[in-house]
From Swiss-Prot:
Pfam families: LysE (PF01810)
Organism: Salmonella typhimurium (strain LT2 / SGSC1412 / ATCC 700720)
InterPro entries for the chain: LeuE-type (IPR001123)
Keywords: Amino-acid transport, Antiport, Cell inner membrane, Cell membrane, Membrane, Transmembrane, Transmembrane helix, Transport
Catalysed transformations (reactions): L-leucine(in) + H(+)(out) = L-leucine(out) + H(+)(in)
Assigned protein family: Belongs to the Rht family.
Main location: membrane
Entry annotated with the keyword Repressor: no
Protein name: Leucine efflux protein
Amino acid sequence: MFAEYGVLNYWTYLVGAIFIVLVPGPNTLFVLKNSVGRGVKGGYLAACGVFIGDAILMFLAYAGVATLIKTTPVLFNIVRYLGAFYLLYLGAKILYATLTSKGRAATETVVPFGAIFKRALILSLTNPKAILFYVSFFVQFIDVTAPHTGVSFFILATTLEIVSFCYLSFLILSGAFVTHYIGTKKKLAKVGNSLIGLLFVGFAARLATLQS
């Protein structure tokens, strides 16, 4: 399928894309948190930020920025530490809001919907490993002798975005359903938010120690 457009082993790529999307990461966790805390609208706003951020990274990967980042340690480290700092900031913010909330559930903390989108977008864009991954993964399924490799790259990128949309939609709808349950379980909500905050701190530490 899509062989005429320079795509190699599309079905193998699709299976790989599904497994990649299923691996939990900060983007997925952020979408899930907002779907639980702000419902379907909050979840999809976070997902839109992730989709647009990923699309930008995929375009940059195709444009050759990935090679520049990989061969320029200073640039890689700047993006890496910015990403780690932002993850740490989000984790600390969640933990602080959870631990300082008293007479109400932590999920009631109001965050403007616009801020949810912006945070998701920044979270997606400040991951230097993502852009390097797109190149290393996509190149395995592109016929470099094809006349228009841009079309091949676009097909693979679109496929990954569709798979991501389906998975995140499942998380959003599930999270919104869970909201009705934990809405009356303040202790459970606090424990859940605390775990999410700690996971963001953990992601920050892992990103800060990654090498190009």
